[in-house]
């Protein structure tokens, strides 16, 4: 009861303007809006894209007004949670934006073979096909949201003075990833391998698809567009993966893996919290997530490795940007 009272206690000095992470979202919204207008004739779903931005504005304004009516910890939490919920709109929007650029999967698939001598996304799940292993790495992959949300909730409850900073770093990492995805259109193995044929991939042939994905009327539920999800089809976590995949997957956002980069950010924040139980509890899931990205064919292994690097950079740079 005492904690709930603390949540609803009116702040002594309410903020009048936007939170730092809301300013980041607004900057991304306005920058991509200019991009849409500049490429209007080349983008097939401009109405949908404008709708996404309208929804983001309305949600942000509504939660800001709610906070102004009752400025307290609870309404701060709702403002941050609102921005996290909007990620479900921003992610598929990157596919609509990067339609103006040619696909680059042939380059990344070639790099993958040069580095590893094979396509890890093709070989890994064939070699390690055991149901228990499939469920483990799939569990790691779908733990993505619980990891960064869990760290955010921990900061809100036990490190409130650092809550806004932690969520600023997490959410801004997403938006920086989205900028990369717009200008670096890589669909990933599940879409590229299906488009060019697994037999070509196995033979080391990586055709340049140019604007193939840009010209699609993509439907995530249509099996002609992607490989079937690998792994133990009757497993609980496989079904969870199917649900999340069908909810909004698009042929975009492969390099670098935002699953890995945001998880790296979350793990740094978990360590920074000085609660070692939090860090060690989440670490096995983070490791499994790394391997799960290319086990389920969402990414090339180089995407996951790049995610380690980008996540470390995001954490270091954004932590200092927030302090400034």
Enumerate the language-model features and the residues they cover.
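Membrane-embedded catalytic cores of phosphoryl/pyrophosphoryl-handling enzymes
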Residues: 231-324
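Aromatic-anchored segments of alpha-helical transmembrane domains
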Residues: 29-37, 86-91, 174-182, 286-295
């Amino acid at each position: 009861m005492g904690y709930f009272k603390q949540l609803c206690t009116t702040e002594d000095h309410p903020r009048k303007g936007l939170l730092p992470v809301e300013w980041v979202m607004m900057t991304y919204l306005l920058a991509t809006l200019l991009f849409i207008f500049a490429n209007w004739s080349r983008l097939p779903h401009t109405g949908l894209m404008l709708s996404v931005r309208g929804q983001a504005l309305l949600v942000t304004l509504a939660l800001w007004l709610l906070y102004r009516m009752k400025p307290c910890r609870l309404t701060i939490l709702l403002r941050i949670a609102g921005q996290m919920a909007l990620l479900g709109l921003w992610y598929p929007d990157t596919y609509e934006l990067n339609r103006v650029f040619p696909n680059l999967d042939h380059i990344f698939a070639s790099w993958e073979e040069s580095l590893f001598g094979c396509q890890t996304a093709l070989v890994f799940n064939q070699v390690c096909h055991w149901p228990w292993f499939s469920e483990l790495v799939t569990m790691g992959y779908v733990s993505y949201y619980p990891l960064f949300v869990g760290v955010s909730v921990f900061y809100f409850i036990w490190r409130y003075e650092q809550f806004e900073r932690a969520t600023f770093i997490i959410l801004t990492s997403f938006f920086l990833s989205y900028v990369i995805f717009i200008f670096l259109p890589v669909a990933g193995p599940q879409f590229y391998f299906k488009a060019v044929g697994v037999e070509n991939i196995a033979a080391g042939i990586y055709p340049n698809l140019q604007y193939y994905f840009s010209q699609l009327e993509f439907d995530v539920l249509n099996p002609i567009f992607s490989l079937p999800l690998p792994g133990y089809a009757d497993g609980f976590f496989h079904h969870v993966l199917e649900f999340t995949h069908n909810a909004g997957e698009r042929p975009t956002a492969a390099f670098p893996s935002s699953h890995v980069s945001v998880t790296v950010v979350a793990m740094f924040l978990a360590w920074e919290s000085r609660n070692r139980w939090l860090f060690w509890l989440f670490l096995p899931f983070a490791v499994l997530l790394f391997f799960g990205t290319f086990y389920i064919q969402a990414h090339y292994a180089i995407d996951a490795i790049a995610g380690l690097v980008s996540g470390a950079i995001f954490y270091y740079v954004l932590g200092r940007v927030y302090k400034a």
